[in-house]
């Protein structure tokens, strides 16, 4: 009886099972992402670092004792690089810019350092017997404007006792002092005075050779850092900037110390720009950036002489000897037309911030002389000019006013130090006339408070020198380059290798940041070009700094610039070594792209690879994963440490040196675990395919048979049916019983799978062996053919060489024989000459 049922085709089942398993493994592997390290990516973050200076001091001032000490700076780059960063938006804040703080500290240090070796004027804190100065001028034909005539009491001729070179001897001397520099001791006696600062501060005399003319200073970032520059024309100093570039150094900034008016600065490229931390807060200073400069010409017309007074051994006091001619006030002249037009534009610009109010200007509301007057230094003299005429609304409402505005000025020699309370400086008088021409490029204003909403009154202000530096540094910020980046890729570090320690590379901050606006995929293509620039940039910058430092070796001490250059050198090397150390710890030394075996965690970022590499820039990606950078770095380092341990164990062969390791229980537990996993997987596959097969056959109309049902099994045609006693043909099929029980089922599946794998592996090995055998035979035949061919051509070349040598030898022999024969004939002819002569004589005698 024939039993019909399901017939299991183990061969096809094994093929489909392996195909499904391979597909599952491939799909699972395709979904895994791994951390990859990139070196040279255009990423930065805001930072605070030590800046150094660059200047062309020698082209401006030949005096080596310039107070700004810019001779110690690095020479400026004749071809400065500026790289525009496409598709980059960066936030700036001029009110929280460390560059301002650093410049302020530097200028204070320069002032202090210029005064350190100079004379203390403590011996001058004595009683002064003063009278109004008497001029020795003549009746000039040129009339002097009454407004420019100096008050007779403005300059006092004072006498006092001082110590000579011999300490126990005193000498009575006289000197000229401005009335602003002395104070009356006794109210009842208008002839006894003292220096104004003797009761409150120490007085230091400026060195006689010091020059006060500001020289442009370029602030530069050390290697590993960059300076970002905002190029928007109407940028207010705060907020986002879409036109960003990166530079190595700032433009030349003149450190002009002044109040109320900003002198000799840069101009706005577009319209007049108003900058304030909070313009609605009347306590905040308003910086007005002009787009057109207004010339201001200042002069001290008096022809002064300077003399020396000894204050004892090693101390010399410089004072005004006499004034030749009529005494006239120092003053400044400003073009009325230019100033009126400028003030009208400033009013209109301020009106845009206060649309419902009338803008008015007024003079300073009071305070120290440095605030109420326009204070600045002109050729070494400190001017204090009255600017009431500049901010007179009534005068400038008259459109017909086109004259020259004259600002009366006073000069002080004892100046309060702007950088520190309780200190004063005595400025040496300058001989001769003094004239300086400057450009007004900005204003420092304050707004009146109160509840008056119809009028907004603005007054000149200043006094905080940081605002002067902000007016020039508003468009810059310092950032630290982060050339190390991590991102997910499909590449994984497969094997542990002992890596060769190659020379590291790095990233310069100009051309290197040019790819900042590109996508991550586009930027990663140029990693080699970007990374090659850092080390060369560091070396070049270090060389420039070293030359500048060597130029100062003849000095007893370094200036503030020299110290900054040393700091910049150390900082650049430290910054570079820090990155190289991380790369070394991660096993990525000398590599621009370094794969790892750290799996990418979707909690760090669940974006797809296409979205990351096709749409995001490195800056955007860095912000995305910045919170997880430390964790990723730690995992990479731990992974590398584990790899190095594994490498050490493999190289030492500690676990395989002895056969007894095979009997270690931990090893066997590991083997058993793997075996259980394999068996479990096979059983799972068996169940899945059985269910699928049953479902498929049920859909075709079959009913599932019991596992105890015998199914027909085809017999091979060359095998007789039955046993010896039961001969005859009983059909081509026979019934077999399905296996029963879980273990039998598992054993049967495992046995069939092993047989299937064995047969296919055997066939594959036979085919591979046959292919290799044929390949070896053909290779051997090809080698023999090449050997015969080489032997043939070698013999041919040998024969050709022999023939060539024979022909050459024959030709040389023939040529040699002819030469020898010719020489022999010539020799015989010479030898026969006497005999021919004798024969001729004999014939003649006969």
From Swiss-Prot:
A lipid is attached at residue 754 (S-palmitoyl cysteine). Glycans are attached at residues 87, 136, 139, 145, 157, 161, 190, 234, 243, 264, 278, 291, 297, 303, 333, 356, 362, 392, 397, 402, 433, 439, 452, 455, 601, 606, 615, 627. The chain crosses the membrane at residues 675-695. Residues 564-582 are annotated as: Immunosuppression. SUPFAM superfamilies: gp120 core (SSF56502), Virus ectodomain (SSF58069). Residues 385-409 are annotated as: V4. The record marks 501-502 as: Cleavage. It holds the Pfam family GP120. Residues 130-157 are annotated as: V1. Residues 364-374 are annotated as: CD4-binding loop. GO terms for cellular component: host cell endosome membrane; host cell plasma membrane; membrane; viral envelope; virion membrane. Keywords: AIDS, Apoptosis, Clathrin-mediated endocytosis of virus by host, Cleavage on pair of basic residues, Coiled coil, Disulfide bond, Fusion of virus membrane with host endosomal membrane, Fusion of virus membrane with host membrane, Glycoprotein, Host cell membrane, Host endosome, Host membrane, Host-virus interaction, Lipoprotein, Membrane, Palmitate, Signal, Transmembrane, Transmembrane helix, Viral attachment to host cell, Viral envelope protein, Viral immunoevasion, Viral penetration into host cytoplasm, Virion, Virus endocytosis by host, Virus entry into host cell. Disulfide bonds join 53-73, 118-207, 125-198, 130-158, 220-249, 230-241, 298-332, 378-436, 385-409, 588-594. A motif (YXXL motif) lies at residues 702-705. One of its GO terms (biological process) is clathrin-dependent endocytosis of virus by host cell. Residues 713-722 have a biased composition (Basic and acidic residues). HAMAP family: HIV_ENV (MF_04083). Inhibitors targeting HIV-1 viral envelope proteins are used as antiretroviral drugs. Attachment of virions to the cell surface via non-specific interactions and CD4 binding can be blocked by inhibitors that include cyanovirin-N, cyclotriazadisulfonamide analogs, PRO 2000, TNX 355 and PRO 542. In addition, BMS 806 can block CD4-induced conformational changes. Env interactions with the coreceptor molecules can be targeted by CCR5 antagonists including SCH-D, maraviroc (UK 427857) and aplaviroc (GW 873140), and the CXCR4 antagonist AMD 070. HIV-1 lineages are divided in three main groups, M (for Major), O (for Outlier), and N (for New, or Non-M, Non-O). The vast majority of strains found worldwide belong to the group M. Group O seems to be endemic to and largely confined to Cameroon and neighboring countries in West Central Africa, where these viruses represent a small minority of HIV-1 strains. The group N is represented by a limited number of isolates from Cameroonian persons. The group M is further subdivided in 9 clades or subtypes (A to D, F to H, J and K). Belongs to the HIV-1 env protein family. This is Envelope glycoprotein gp160. It comes from Human immunodeficiency virus type 1 group M subtype F1 (isolate 93BR020). The lineage of its organism: Viruses, Riboviria, Pararnavirae, Artverviricota, Revtraviricetes. The gene is env.
């Amino acid at each position: 009886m024939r039993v019909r049922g399901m017939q299991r085709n183990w061969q096809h089942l094994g093929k489909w099972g392996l195909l499904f398993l391979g597909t599952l493994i491939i799909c699972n592997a395709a979904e895994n992402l791994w951390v990859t390290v990139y070196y040279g990516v255009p990423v930065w973050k805001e930072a605070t670092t030590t800046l150094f200076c660059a200047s062309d001091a020698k082209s401006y001032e030949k005096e080596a004792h310039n107070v700004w000490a810019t001779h110690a700076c690095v020479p400026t780059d004749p071809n400065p690089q500026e790289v525009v960063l496409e598709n980059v938006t960066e936030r700036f804040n001029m009110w929280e810019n460390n560059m301002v703080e650093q410049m302020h500290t530097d200028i204070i240090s320069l002032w202090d350092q210029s005064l350190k070796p100079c004379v203390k004027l403590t011996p001058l804190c004595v009683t002064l017997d003063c009278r109004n100065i008497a001029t020795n001028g003549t009746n000039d034909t040129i009339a002097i404007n009454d407004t420019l005539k100096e008050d007779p009491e403005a300059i006092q001729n004072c006498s006092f006792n001082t110590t000579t070179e011999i300490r126990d001897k005193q000498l009575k001397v006289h000197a000229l002092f401005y009335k602003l520099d002395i104070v009356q001791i006794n109210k009842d006696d208008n002839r006894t005075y003292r220096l104004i600062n003797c009761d409150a501060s120490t007085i230091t005399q400026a060195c006689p050779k010091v020059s006060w003319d500001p020289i442009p200073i370029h602030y530069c970032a050390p290697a590993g850092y960059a300076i970002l520059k905002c190029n928007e024309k109407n940028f207010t100093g705060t907020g986002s900037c879409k036109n960003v570039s990166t530079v190595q150094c700032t433009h030349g900034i003149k450190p002009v110390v002044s109040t109320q008016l900003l002198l000799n600065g840069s101009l706005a490229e577009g319209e007049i720009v108003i900058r304030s931390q909070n313009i609605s807060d009347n306590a905040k200073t308003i910086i007005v950036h002009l787009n057109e400069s207004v010339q201001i010409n200042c002069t001290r017309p008096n022809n002064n002489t300077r003399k020396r007074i000894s204050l004892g051994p090693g101390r010399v006091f410089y004072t005004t000897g006499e004034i030749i001619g009529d005494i006239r006030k120092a003053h400044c002249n400003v073009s009325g037309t230019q100033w009126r037009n400028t003030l009208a534009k400033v009013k209109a610009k301020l009106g845009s911030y206060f649309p419902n109010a009338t803008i008015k200007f007024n003079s300073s509301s009071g305070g120290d002389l440095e605030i109420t007057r326009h204070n600045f230094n002109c050729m070494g003299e400190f001017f204090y000019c009255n600017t009431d005429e500049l901010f007179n609304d009534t005068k400038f409402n008259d459109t017909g006013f086109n004259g020259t505005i004259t600002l009366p000025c006073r000069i002080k020699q004892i100046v309060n130090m702007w950088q520190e309370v309780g200190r004063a400086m005595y400025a040496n008088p300058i001989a001769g006339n003094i004239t300086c021409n400057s450009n007004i490029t900005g204003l420092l204003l304050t707004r009146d408070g109160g509840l008056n909403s119809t009028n907004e009154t603005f007054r000149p202000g200043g006094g905080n020198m940081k605002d002067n530096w902000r007016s020039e540094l508003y468009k810059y910020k310092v950032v630290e380059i982060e050339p190390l980046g991590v991102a997910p890729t499909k590449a994984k570090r497969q094997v542990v290798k002992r890596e060769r320690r190659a020379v590291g590379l790095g990233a310069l901050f100009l051309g290197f940041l040019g790819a900042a606006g590109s996508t991550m995929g586009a930027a990663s293509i140029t990693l080699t070009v970007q990374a090659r620039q850092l080390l060369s940039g560091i070396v070049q910058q270090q060389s420039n700094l070293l030359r500048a430092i060597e130029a100062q070796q003849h000095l007893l001490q370094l200036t503030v610039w020299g110290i900054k250059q040393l700091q910049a050198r150390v900082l650049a090397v430290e910054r570079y070594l820090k990155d190289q150390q991380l790369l070394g710890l991660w096993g990525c030394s000398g590599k621009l792209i370094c794969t790892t075996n750290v799996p990418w965690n979707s909690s760090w970022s669940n974006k797809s690879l296409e979205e990351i590499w096709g749409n995001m820039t490195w800056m955007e990606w860095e912000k995305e994963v910045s919170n997880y950078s430390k964790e990723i770095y730690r995992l990479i380092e731990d992974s590398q440490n584990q790899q190095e341990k594994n490498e050490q164990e493999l190289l030492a062969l500690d676990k395989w040196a002895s056969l007894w390791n095979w009997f270690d229980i931990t090893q066997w537990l590991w083997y058993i675990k793997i075996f259980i996993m394999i068996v479990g997987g096979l059983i799972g596959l068996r169940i899945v395919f059985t269910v699928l097969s049953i479902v498929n056959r049920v859909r075709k109309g079959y009913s599932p048979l019991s596992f105890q049902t015998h199914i027909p099994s085809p017999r091979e045609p060359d095998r007789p049916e039955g046993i010896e006693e039961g001969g005859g043909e009983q059909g081509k099929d026979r019934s077999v019983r399905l296996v029963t029980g879980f273990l039998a089922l598992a054993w049967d599946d495992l046995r069939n799978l092993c047989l299937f794998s064995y047969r296919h592996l055997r066939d594959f090995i036979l085919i591979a062996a046959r292919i290799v055998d044929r390949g070896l035979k053909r290779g051997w035949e090809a080698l023999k053919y090449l050997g015969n061919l080489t032997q043939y051509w070698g013999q041919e070349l040998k024969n050709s060489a022999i023939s060539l040598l024979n022909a050459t030898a024959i030709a040389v022999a023939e040529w040699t024989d002819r030469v020898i024969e010719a020489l022999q004939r010539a020799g015989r002819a010479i030898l026969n000459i006497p005999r021919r002569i004798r024969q001729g004589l004999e014939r003649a005698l006969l």
